[in-house]
Curated annotation (Swiss-Prot):
Protein source organism: Oryza sativa subsp. japonica (Rice)
Sequence ranges of Basic and acidic residues compositional bias: 95-107
Subcellular location: Nucleus
Stretch list, region Disordered: 92-117
Name of the molecule in the record: Putative B3 domain-containing protein Os11g0625400
Length: 215
């Protein structure tokens, strides 16, 4: 089975082949999966259930072959894997900024503005605790805030990995940023329901794009 990995703003996403990957592995919503890229041609996959207990590791038995892929994407062939679980969670973090040339800190200029001292809400603390077991000790998180100058006018936003999904980002009179015109369809398509907790990551590449973590 072959998938393509795309790097956007310091995070990796499966841009092609994800539906087939889910079908072949039997992944289910609400459970967790960890991808560990050891070399450009080798990938390990670890599985966790809802209680974060480790399942059987999905470790490939041979080297993976790199396939030709579009710019900023990597094609990786993955062997057949046993039934496992899935969490559609996009992790945005960075390694030590002094040693990692691919870290998110290298892309901070592409973000409208950022703050290392933003207040961390209980929901974000819980989110970090859930995925903390997957991260290296040097990993750092950045909470992105919107620059007032950037938000003087409404902005068109594209969903990462899809040029056809666009929404309108609007700043209300009480300084809240809202996604309008296209959000309802996007939420319904991606099973985002009332009371869902979402973390939004905005960046420019060169247009404003977004990834959404649903907790």
């Amino acid at each position: 089975m072959t998938v393509e990995l795309e790097k956007i703003a310091g995070s990796f996403f499966i841009s092609k082949g994800w539906k087939t990957f889910v079908h072949r592995t039997g992944l289910l919503s609400g459970q967790y999966i960890r991808f560990q890229v050891l070399t450009p041609s080798k990938i390990n996959v670890l599985l966790f259930d809802k209680k974060k207990d480790s399942k059987l590791p999905m470790i490939p038995s041979s080297k993976k072959q790199i396939k030709t892929a579009p710019k900023r994407s990597t094609g990786i062939t993955i062997n057949d894997m046993p039934t496992s679980k899935h969490a559609s969670m996009l992790i945005s973090h960075t390694s030590n900024k002094e040693t990692s040339s691919d870290s998110r800190t290298e892309s901070m200029t592409d973000i409208p503005s950022s703050s290392d001292n933003s207040a961390v809400t209980p929901d974000i603390k819980n989110y970090i605790s859930i995925i903390g077991q997957f991260l290296q000790r040097s990993s750092k998180f950045y909470i992105v805030t919107m620059n007032n100058t950037f938000m003087k006018q409404d902005r068109l936003v594209e969903a990462a990995g899809s040029d056809s999904v666009t929404m309108l980002l609007h700043k209300s009179s009480d300084d809240r940023c809202n996604l309008k015109r296209g959000w309802a369809t996007f939420a319904a398509t991606n099973a985002i329901h009332l009371h869902s907790v979402c973390i939004f990551h905005f960046y420019k590449a060169p247009n404003v794009k977004i990834t959404i973590d649903v907790l």
